A protein has these predicted regions:
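Active-site pocket-lining/capping segments in soluble small-molecule metabolic enzymes
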Residues: 1-147, 151, 157-299
Length: 299
């Protein structure tokens, strides 16, 4: 079933809250600046000091009440990124993480959710916060399509984010029944080396760091020392371009697309949204509305 709207799931719910306070009014009040086939489905992230966190170390000191008020105002779902893969039973009673889940579960408006890796945590959340939806994290590094399909078939999850190396498995993707296509949420802008064999180890190091354990991990994959560069992500074999989303994935029946980058700065986040959401003729206007004025000095 061909889809007509691409729903983007954006990074930085807590980490880039100040940015979204400016960007979201612009997006919803000036829809002529943005592609009419694009919509925002959710914002995801986690504040600092969350032991359930994973994927990236969370940041941002904004309260749950502040971020939820923002997402409610624009009819968006808010997702907690709680994808720590190394949780133990004693971690489930953590007061900070439970308080966040309570706030998200009780919030009015669209259903909020949790991005999760650990089945231990998933079972706990299902029992204690059934109002939330649950999204299977890409940190599981499911690079075998059979594994991905099994994950999509799990009734526990409203969405599954595949490993980016399955983004171009077109024959298998086309063969999915529509209900499973509707649950598939592609990671569009991954910069990690396509052939990296350390991805799982990298995520585990972040999980340990969130637990307060020493877990320094130096990635040796090609290009890792340069950090995240959007230009490099665009050259990645797993990259999903605007043209591919509109002309390949929507016609195939897929409609959910995730952007990574909650640990990056707001300047990089803006570049993502200019590329994926904004019509080229209006990109300068969006920059001017966000930060650009005649007195700005770069050096």
């Amino acid at each position: 079933m061909r889809k007509t709207i691409a729903y983007f799931h954006l990074p930085g719910l807590f980490e880039a809250y100040a940015f979204y306070r400016v960007f979201l009014p612009l997006f919803f009040e000036h829809r002529e600046y943005f592609y009419d086939w694009c919509a925002i489905g959710s914002l995801h992230g986690a504040p600092a000091d969350c032991i359930w966190g994973g994927g990236r170390v969370g940041s941002g000191e904004w309260s749950a009440q502040e971020v939820l008020a923002l997402t409610r105002a624009y009819g968006l779902s808010a997702r907690l990124t709680f994808s720590n893969s190394l949780l133990r039973p004693e971690h489930l009673s953590d007061g900070r993480c439970n308080a966040l889940c309570r706030a998200f579960a009780r919030s009015d408006g669209p259903q909020n959710g949790v991005i999760v890796h650990s089945d231990l945590l998933l079972d706990y959340l299902k029992a204690n916060y059934p109002q939330l939806s649950f999204i299977s994290s890409t940190t599981k590094v499911l690079t075998n399509f059979r594994q991905l399909r099994q994950e999509l078939e799990r009734a526990d999850f409203s969405a599954v984010v595949p490993d980016f190396r399955l983004n171009k498995a077109f024959d298998d993707l086309r063969a999915l029944p529509q209900p499973l296509k509707d649950k598939t949420e592609f990671l569009c802008n991954e910069c990690c080396s396509f052939g990296c064999r350390e991805r799982r180890a990298c995520y585990e190091a972040v999980s340990r760091k969130n637990l307060g354990e020493q877990a320094e991990h130096i990635c040796t994959a090609p290009g890792a020392s340069a950090g995240y560069r959007f230009s490099s992500a665009m050259e990645n074999p797993g990259f999903l371009s605007v043209g591919a989303i509109r002309n390949v994935y929507l016609p195939m029946g897929f409609s959910n697309f995730k952007l990574e980058g909650r640990g990056l700065g707001s300047a990089m986040l803006l570049e993502f949204l200019l590329y994926y959401l904004t019509k080229p003729a209006y990109r300068l206007r969006v920059r001017e509305a966000i930060y650009l004025d005649a007195m700005l000095d770069l050096f």
